[in-house]
């Protein structure tokens, strides 16, 4: 696939300002996440550990998908530039907060956890309505801000209806649906719903036990088939005085 010319963020004044790297937040096998500043704004840079054509194209693809998304529960993609202090990089909104694991370690209330569940469902429902599967829903890809609102991040493994990557495995072994781990690729919304079920188990396992069991069935056709269906089941459970 040919490498395209650099894509700049639409805000030309913002894009021409110098980027100052402030530190590495995390580093994986392929990518580094940097906190940075451009002018007076904090931003996130996602750059390749090994700068080559393949990883640059992955970053560009993530930009092309992320730039089409706009939702309060999804991190904003600002641009992609090849000439940054970190090399070719995806430029993202900086979200102050902590990972879902860190948030849960503080022992939040049931109502606070329910708000997080609702935010995740809102964000994933928006993605699915736009023909996008996140394909890597896990605690480290959920950021909780100081107000207790959740944002979904990292669309590097996401798949859209017109994607040439539909058959890719993707996901993280601890949270991926069985069909993905078997190399069959995602089974539509049901694969993201499997991962959401595991997140709900981690947050409120006892409260939503039967709902989780259905989310996490091995056969994707036996799971909830859409976020609205899952949302209705959760709303019904919250209304009941005892576990169902």
Give the predicted meaning of each segment.
Residues 116-117:
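Activation segment signature within eukaryotic-like protein kinase domains
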